[in-house]
UniProtKB/Swiss-Prot annotation:
Its main location: cytoplasm. SUPFAM superfamilies: WD40 repeat-like. Induces disassembly of actin filaments in conjunction with ADF/cofilin family proteins. Together with GMF, promotes Arp2/3-nucleated actin filament array disassembly. Essential for organismal and cell viability. Required for the development of normal wing cell planar polarity. In egg chambers and together with GMF, plays an important role in directional migration of border cell clusters. It is found in: Cytoplasm, Cytoskeleton. The keyword Metal-binding does not apply. PROSITE patterns: WD_REPEATS_2 (PS50082), WD_REPEATS_REGION (PS50294). This is Actin-interacting protein 1. It comes from the Eukaryota. One of its GO terms (cellular component) is cytoskeleton.
Amino acid sequence: MAQPQPPAYENKNIYATLPRTQRGQPIVLGADPKGKNFLYTNGNSVIIRNIENPAIADVYTEHSCAVNVAKYSPSGFYIASGDASGKIRIWDTVNKEHLLKNEFQPIAGPIKDISWSPDNQRIVAVGEGRERFGHVFMSETGTSVGEISGQSKSINSADFRPARPFRIVTGSEDNTIAVFEGPPFKFKMTKQDHSRFVQAVRYSPDGKFFASAGFDGKVFLYDGTSSELVGEFGSPAHKGGVYALAWKPDSTQLLTCSGDKTCRLWTVESRELVSEFVMGTTVDDQQVSCLWQGDNLITVSLSGVITYLNVADPSKPLRVVKGHNKPITVLGLSDDRSTIYTGSHDGVVTNWNSGSGTNDRITGTGHGNQINGIAAWGDFVYTCGIDDSLRQFSVEGNSYTDYVVKLNCQPRGLAILRNENIIALACIKELTLVQDQKKIFSLPIKYEASSIAVNADTSDVAVGGDDQKLHIYTLKGGVLEPKVELDHLGAVTDVSYSPDLKYLVACDAHRKVVLYSVEEYKPAHNKEWGFHSARVNTVAWSPNSLLVASGSLDTTIIIWSVANPAKHTIIKNAHPQSQITRLVWLDNNTVISTGQDCNTKVWHVENI
């Protein structure tokens, strides 16, 4: 009997994006009733992240526009997620495919919060609709079980009382809290204690109280049944707007987080402050969300960073989860391949341990905006960005050094000729060579360069151009001399020499990947590598020079065989609804990809 073939590829790991944040906008984290994961969103994706080991994550990308909020059902078997168009998708958590159970359109505008009734049967969804700001419906059928009315502006937050008699509370931008009784749910009263937007309303897990938080810095406590005001936490609770609040599972304490860059822990009974967590001093340290799940107190900063608070010692967080929440534009490896480097279009550079996925951010003064090139060389990693500079950070110190070379125009890529001690940069209007932190040569060009690669054997430099040509230069005595031009059918987007220096591969906007032999710069075979259906963004070589990986705007990665050009492996939907921005091989069977979705993925690929 024939042995079953191993799968041609497998997704080993996802180094997940951080939550997408926006100044002045609270975000909602979703708690898992089984205590294993927590939920947040970024772009079209819902991220299901393991709470004990954040290196484990699952990503759901089925919404056709930005997702704002996702919440587990109390049973833990379903997740409801709401997007910017007002759609709610209810999907299964048990299967890896996350099968869709239902899709409803409760309001015609962005959904800002979702809450399930404790019996899993009803859902309240609120936001910024056209004719109404919220709706209550059955999770199975979508039939209405009441109406959310009585508030005149967008509703930011809603919660179901977790015990009978059922109640719903909503917090709105008209500064009021509305209370509804049912089912069917009818407007009962408004509370007008806040003087600014109400950003969060949450019932205690036992249903005895509910608390509200607003941009006036105040946090109020109300009776869960009668909805009478019980009192206020602090006077006021925070110096800045309060973005979110979270109850301790036993209902005895409350956690609040604020734009004043602090989180505070309160006793519910006496409404007194227990401890304060100072999260930093910069705008990026504003706290925009919090969650209390089991023993984990989690907060999210404006920078997207997730912090696990330490109740025993407020000054030392238990864990800080870093990464990216903007699209990743560059990807590189340290010389020993133990560290993966990623850089995003907001200038953040992250290092990831290639074995465990643990990560940290590079500190110091970097580019502060989009990074277009990255390359490691010994103890340093070099980056170039659209601040028109070349910079370096130290591998050991994990921090940018004071090495800066100002460039005349925007760099699009960099490559290092180690034996010559030269860094070659492809810029929009010129090619520049840098040696010992000085520009030693620049060559004006009539095309716009997109990428650059160097061949240490022949001292050839290959540059991709938007003039549909691949330009080859030779480096002689610190000067670049044109050697040959190779025609493509579209703008050349990326170029790379094979590790054994015998081949050059280039990809273009006309969906093609072309392999050249370096000897004569002629195509290495007569097969057309044209299976992408849109612009190819990036190409990368396996260390043994036998396989080429290409990533495209069409969301797929294709692995091509050099020895057997007719064979290839297609990884469809590698980053769903997101173009592949960069690829690199960790070893001969492992490819790392980054996408517009801010995720970094690790793939195991079988030999072809």
